[in-house]
């Protein structure tokens, strides 16, 4: 069986890229009736020549009412005045149809009745000349727009879509720095802003000028604050490693570790290493190595912050950032966080509900220290008892036995 007897399904949809070299048939006589555009038969296919379906009309023998539609105007509603907001696309016939070829048609936007009102009958002058491609002359308030204007304006009035014409719109190249067209540019070159030194100020729009000057001033103040903070951080030396923090070899180490209750200078890596020491008690490792003031947490920062108000803002931003991360100890309700309500991380269940902060309980130990814990479990008590540090009296006993042995041997210890 030859493939030329099979209709190309890509050609039926209008997307065959093989063209005349296709191995399948490109004869529309073998195509199915479903490939005919039903919107074109109704007279208002918005795709026009770009439609993938066939813009052909059945003959009069195939259907009486449908066949006569090919010789009539697509829709009588196009000739009746309606509100300009109700707009659709209509196809104007430009040439006679040849079998096997797609007609070339021009897409024109017309007013269309969408309110369900009774439509006027077709004028006799239009029916008398079915092959004519002439259209009724639209009135000034029904001026047809192009398809591109309809896309830009959202099928609304073109003049209402933009507040300025091309001559009143600012040139984007001049606003970015330089326009190669110069004085020949069709767009408007704005005035130079005194802060950013760019041509971004519209000469005829005072509101745009005020808005840009406000944004530009806020940006300028923010950049100045960063410059002052960088200048104040250049000579800061870490009190542990005794190196200038911003002059370290690794870029990851050029960060400050700011203590919440202290103003001494440390780099982030050194103060974290200090607070991770295991040979000291918790109050010692949480205190400043110089002034011994206890700080609950360390805030990483690119710049050095010494002012208390700035530090409070930095602490709040740090807490908000930590509050967005899930706590690895809580594990969405499966685990227990040892920090309780003091934890800075997010305690949330799998459904997104936040866990209510649990009040820690106090316990007085035999050594006189107060311990805080959230829950009491038997295994925690046993594990704590097994790991409790007991003073080693073996050295004391051996010293006493040695002194007793020396006394019995008649050897007197020399006094200083």
UniProtKB/Swiss-Prot annotation:
CDD domains: RING-HC_MKRN2. It is found in: Cytoplasm; Nucleus. One of its GO terms (cellular component) is nucleus. Expressed in sperm, with significantly reduced expression in sperm of patients with oligoasthenoteratozoospermia (at protein level). Widely expressed with expression in testis, ovary, small intestine, colon, peripheral blood leukocytes, fetal liver, bone marrow, thymus, lymph node and spleen. Residues 113-122 have a biased composition (Basic and acidic residues). One of its GO terms (biological process) is negative regulation of non-canonical NF-kappaB signal transduction. Pathway: Protein modification; protein ubiquitination. It holds the Pfam family zf-CCCH_2. The modification Phosphoserine is found at residue 139. It comes from the Eukaryota. Residues 123-136 have a biased composition (Polar residues). A zinc finger (C3H1-type) spans 2-29, 31-58, 165-192, 321-350. GO terms for molecular function: RNA binding; ubiquitin protein ligase activity; zinc ion binding. SMART domains: RING, ZnF_C3H1. Keywords: Cytoplasm, Differentiation, Metal-binding, Nucleus, Phosphoprotein, Repeat, Spermatogenesis, Transferase, Ubl conjugation pathway, Zinc, Zinc-finger. A zinc finger (RING-type) spans 238-292. It is an enzyme of class 2 (transferase). It catalyses: S-ubiquitinyl-[E2 ubiquitin-conjugating enzyme]-L-cysteine + [acceptor protein]-L-lysine = [E2 ubiquitin-conjugating enzyme]-L-cysteine + N(6)-ubiquitinyl-[acceptor protein]-L-lysine. Its EC number is 2.3.2.27. Residues 113-142 are annotated as: Disordered. Residues 193-222 are annotated as: Makorin-type Cys-His. Interacts with PDLIM2 (via LIM zinc-binding domain). Interacts with RELA. Partially overlaps and is antisense to the RAF1 proto-oncogene. E3 ubiquitin ligase catalyzing the covalent attachment of ubiquitin moieties onto substrate proteins. Promotes the polyubiquitination and proteasome-dependent degradation of RELA/p65, thereby suppressing RELA-mediated NF-kappaB transactivation and negatively regulating inflammatory responses. Plays a role in the regulation of spermiation and in male fertility. This is E3 ubiquitin-protein ligase makorin-2. It comes from Homo sapiens. The gene is MKRN2.
């Amino acid at each position: 069986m030859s493939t030329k007897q099979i209709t190309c399904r890509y050609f039926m949809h209008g997307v065959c890229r093989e063209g005349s070299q296709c191995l399948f048939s490109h004869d529309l006589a073998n195509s199915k009736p479903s490939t005919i555009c039903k919107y074109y038969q109704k007279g208002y296919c918005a795709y026009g020549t770009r439609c993938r379906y066939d813009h052909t009309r059945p003959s009069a023998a195939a259907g009486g009412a449908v066949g006569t539609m090919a010789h009539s105007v697509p829709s009588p509603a196009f000739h009746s005045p309606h509100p300009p907001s109700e707009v659709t696309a209509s196809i104007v016939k430009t040439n006679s149809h040849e079998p096997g070829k797609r007609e070339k048609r021009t897409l024109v936007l017309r007013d269309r009745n969408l309110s369900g009102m009774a439509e006027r009958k077709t004028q006799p002058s239009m029916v008398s000349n079915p092959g004519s491609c002439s259209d009724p002359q639209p009135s000034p308030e029904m001026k047809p727009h192009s398809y591109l204007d309809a896309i830009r304006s959202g099928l609304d009035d073109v003049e209402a879509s933009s507040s300025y014409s091309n001559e009143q719109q600012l040139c984007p190249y001049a606003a970015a720095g330089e326009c190669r067209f110069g004085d020949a540019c069709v767009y408007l070159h704005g005035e130079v802003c005194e802060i950013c030194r760019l041509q971004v100020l519209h000469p005829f729009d005072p509101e745009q000028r005020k808005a840009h000057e406000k944004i530009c001033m806020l940006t300028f103040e923010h950049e100045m604050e960063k410059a002052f903070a960088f200048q104040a951080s250049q000579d800061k030396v870490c009190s542990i490693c005794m190196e200038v923090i911003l002059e370290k070899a690794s870029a990851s180490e050029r960060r400050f570790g700011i203590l919440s209750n202290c103003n001494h200078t440390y780099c982030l890596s050194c103060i974290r290493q200090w607070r991770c020491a295991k040979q000291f008690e918790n109050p010692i490792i949480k205190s400043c190595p110089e002034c011994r003031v206890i700080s609950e947490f360390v805030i990483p920062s690119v710049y050095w912050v010494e002012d208390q108000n700035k530090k409070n803002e930095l602490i709040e931003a740090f807490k908000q950032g930590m509050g967005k991360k899930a706590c690895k100890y809580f594990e969405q309700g499966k685990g227990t966080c040892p920090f309780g309500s003091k934890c800075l991380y997010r305690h949330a269940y799998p459904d997104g509900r936040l866990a209510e902060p649990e009040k820690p309980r106090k316990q007085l130990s035999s050594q006189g220290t107060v311990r805080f814990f959230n829950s009491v479990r038997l295994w925690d008590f046993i594990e704590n008892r097994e790991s409790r540090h007991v003073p080693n009296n073996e050295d004391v006993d051996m010293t006493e036995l040695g002194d007793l042995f020396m006394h019995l041997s008649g050897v007197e210890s020399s006094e200083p």
